[in-house]
């Protein structure tokens, strides 16, 4: 089985920044990977296209995926509002790791974050389900629009997304 690859075309205040592609670890966390894949294609009638990265902290991570409220309080999974932590086999080993944001145990929806550093304190709390395959330089460029409290100086959006 080949792990799926999805892409995000990132824009800054409506201007194209570039493409980031992700390998989704369907071999280790199939349910979590399938949620992200389907939200990237929009095949269920909802998903990431047009949503923003509402929280970017340089030297830590870029967080997005709230396509219902756009502020970090919303989002939903393809399985209903929330789903369980599938497993914690994969670790937050460094830049480029793709992991689920949550509000405590078994509260995965659609929010995710891309690590820009090793974040081992998140191991066992957040489900790692993918990695940046290409376009880490775009993620690094996104960091410049973040701040210590996570507020972004410009609107960073997923202008387009899908499966490769």
UniProtKB/Swiss-Prot annotation:
List of residues that carry Phosphoserine: 77
CDD domains tied to this protein: cyclophilin_ABH_like
N-acetylmethionine modifications at: 1
Positions glycosylated per UniProt: 108
Main enzyme class: isomerase
EC numbers, comma separated: 5.2.1.8
Extent of the signal sequence: none
Cystine bridges: none
Cited Gene3D superfamilies: Cyclophilin-like (2.40.100.10)
Modification N6-acetyllysine occurs at: 28, 44, 76, 82, 125, 133
Post-translational modification: Acetylation at Lys-125 markedly inhibits catalysis of cis to trans isomerization. PPIA acetylation also antagonizes the immunosuppressive effects of cyclosporine by inhibiting the sequential steps of cyclosporine binding and calcineurin inhibition. Acetylation at Lys-125 favors the interaction with TARDBP.
Keywords from the UniProt entry: Acetylation, Apoptosis, Cytoplasm, Glycoprotein, Isomerase, Isopeptide bond, Nucleus, Phosphoprotein, Rotamase, Secreted, Ubl conjugation
Record GO biological process: activation of protein kinase B activity; apoptotic process; cell adhesion molecule production; cellular response to oxidative stress; endothelial cell activation; leukocyte chemotaxis; negative regulation of oxidative stress-induced intrinsic apoptotic signaling pathway; negative regulation of protein K48-linked ubiquitination
Reaction equations catalysed: [protein]-peptidylproline (omega=180) = [protein]-peptidylproline (omega=0)
Activity regulation behaviour: Binds cyclosporin A (CsA). CsA mediates some of its effects via an inhibitory action on PPIase.
GO cellular component: cytoplasm; cytosol; extracellular region; nucleus
Cross-link Glycyl lysine isopeptide (Lys-Gly) (interchain with G-Cter in SUMO2) residue location(s): 28, 82
Predominant location category: cytoplasm
InterPro entries, alphabetized: Cyclophilin-like_dom_sf, Cyclophilin-type_PPIase, Cyclophilin-type_PPIase_CS, Cyclophilin-type_PPIase_dom
Organism superkingdom: Eukaryota
Cited function: Catalyzes the cis-trans isomerization of proline imidic peptide bonds in oligopeptides. Exerts a strong chemotactic effect on leukocytes partly through activation of one of its membrane receptors BSG/CD147, initiating a signaling cascade that culminates in MAPK/ERK activation. Activates endothelial cells (ECs) in a proinflammatory manner by stimulating activation of NF-kappa-B and ERK, JNK and p38 MAP-kinases and by inducing expression of adhesion molecules including SELE and VCAM1.
PANTHER family: PEPTIDYL-PROLYL CIS-TRANS ISOMERASE, PEPTIDYL-PROLYL CIS-TRANS ISOMERASE A
Assembly: Interacts with protein phosphatase PPP3CA/calcineurin A. Interacts with isoform 2 of BSG/CD147. Interacts with FOXO1; the interaction promotes FOXO1 dephosphorylation, nuclear accumulation and transcriptional activity. Interacts with integrin ITGA2B:ITGB3; the interaction is ROS and peptidyl-prolyl cis-trans isomerase (PPIase) activity-dependent and is increased in the presence of thrombin. Interacts with MAP3K5.
Protein name per Swiss-Prot or TrEMBL: Peptidyl-prolyl cis-trans isomerase A
Organism: Oryctolagus cuniculus (Rabbit)
Upper lineage: Eukaryota, Metazoa, Chordata, Craniata, Vertebrata
């Amino acid at each position: 089985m080949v792990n799926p690859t999805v892409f995000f075309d990132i824009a800054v205040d409506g201007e194209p920044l570039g493409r980031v592609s992700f390998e989704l670890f369907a071999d280790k966390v199939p349910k979590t990977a399938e949620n992200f894949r389907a939200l990237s294609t929009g095949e269920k009638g909802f998903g990431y296209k047009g949503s923003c990265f509402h929280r970017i902290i340089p030297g830590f991570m870029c967080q997005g995926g709230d396509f219902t409220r756009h502020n970090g309080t919303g989002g939903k999974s393809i399985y209903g509002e929330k789903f369980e932590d599938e497993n914690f086999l994969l670790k937050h080993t460094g830049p480029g790791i793709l992991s689920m944001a949550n509000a405590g145990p078994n509260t995965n929806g659609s929010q995710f974050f891309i690590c820009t550093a090793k974040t081992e304190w998140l191991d066992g709390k957040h489900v790692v389900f993918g990695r940046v395959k290409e376009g880490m330089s775009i993620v690094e460029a996104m960091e410049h629009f973040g701040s210590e409290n996570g507020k972004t100086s410009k609107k960073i959006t997923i202008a387009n997304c899908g499966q490769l």
